[in-house]
Structure formats: structure tokens, C-alpha cells
């Protein structure tokens, strides 16, 4: 029978005393270790504050919980989630993901009628957040070419000053493969 769980496996090495503490706490509460871990991770990320990657409505929103921002961009569509994260910049998503998103958002080839951020999963209404940019893309095309764009961005980073255009890169790639 197929495993229908949408959960993913997380593997990490931790100090032996933390593992023992986790096991003892789970036993004492009659809970599964995985549930306690999920709660600890979510609470830990909730406690981390970041510079708000959106336009804040109020001055007190200049710093927000990481999970508030993450929840605003989350999608089970991995490409959309990564595009949203990268569109918020390198401080939020790291350099490579930001470069991929910047390339896609700035290339007419990927333009379309899909609003990348939409209502930010309700955060526009709840918090008054607005993204700094409102990219509109052809999402099926972005989904199809996302891995190629990731390769292209890595290629450009590793082969400076050589900078072929995206179409030239795709042609080089198809001839090599």
C-alpha cells in the first residue's frame, strides 16, 4: 500500500542529550517524537525575526516573524513557492534563488497573466503587506523551464566573464546533451 503522507523526511545529527531530552519529553507527554519536533521547529522559526520583506503597513511591522513571511509566500507548488521567495530578494531567499527569480521576473519571455504573489495567502488583508514588485508570469512556462534557468544562473556565476544569452545557453545545452 502506498504511503499517502505528504510529510518529508528530515535527517539531522543532534547532541545525545537533546535526543534523550526529546525522547523523555515525548514519553512523559505520551506524544510522538515527530509531533514534538514539528512543534519545536515551528515555534523556533516563529521566534526568529527578520526585516519585513514586504512593504509594511505600520512602522511596527518593519521586523516580523520569519514564519509570518514564510506563510505569506508558501505554496505546495514548489516552483511558485521558490519564485515568490526569490522575488523577495537575497536577504530572504539566498543569492542563487534571488538571481533565478530576478531573471524570470525581468525576462519578457516569461511574462504572462499569473500574479506571482496574489493576496499573499491572506496577508494582504490580515497584515496589509504588499510585495515591493508585482511580477506577472506565464506560470506553466516558468514551471517547465525552472530547472534550466537554475542551471543557467549557476553557469553564469561559474563562468564569468562569459555571459551567453538565455536562448544561446539553451542551444549550447541542447547541442551538448
Language-model regions, residue ranges each:
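Charged, low-complexity intrinsically disordered terminal regions and linker tails
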Residues: 53-177
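Short, basic amphipathic alpha-helical segments that act as recognition/interaction helices
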Residues: 19-21, 25-56
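Residue-level marker of intrinsically disordered, low-complexity segments enriched
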Residues: 6-7, 48, 102, 114
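Short Lys/Arg-rich basic patches
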Residues: 1-19, 23-31
Amino acid at each position: 500500500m502506498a504511503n499517502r503522507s505528504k510529510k518529508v523526511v528530515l535527517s539531522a545529527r543532534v547532541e545525545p542529550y537533546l535526543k534523550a531530552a526529546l525522547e523523555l519529553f515525548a514519553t512523559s507527554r505520551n506524544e510522538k517524537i515527530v509531533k514534538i519536533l514539528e512543534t519545536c521547529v515551528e515555534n523556533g522559526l516563529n521566534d526568529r525575526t527578520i526585516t519585513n520583506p514586504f512593504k509594511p503597513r505600520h512602522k511596527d511591522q518593519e521586523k516580523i516573524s520569519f514564519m509570518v513571511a514564510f506563510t505569506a509566500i508558501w505554496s505546495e507548488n514548489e516552483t511558485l513557492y521558490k519564485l515568490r521567495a526569490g522575488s523577495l530578494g537575497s536577504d530572504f531567499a539566498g543569492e542563487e534563488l534571488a538571481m533565478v527569480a530576478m531573471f524570470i521576473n525581468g525576462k519578457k519571455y516569461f511574462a504572462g497573466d499569473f500574479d506571482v504573489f496574489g493576496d499573499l495567502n491572506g496577508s494582504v488583508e490580515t497584515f496589509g503587506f504588499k510585495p515591493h514588485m508585482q511580477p506577472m508570469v506565464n506560470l506553466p512556462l516558468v514551471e517547465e523551464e525552472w530547472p534550466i534557468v537554475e542551471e543557467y544562473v549557476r553557469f553564469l556565476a561559474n563562468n564569468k566573464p562569459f555571459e551567453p544569452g538565455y536562448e544561446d545557453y539553451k542551444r549550447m545545452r541542447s547541442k551538448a546533451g
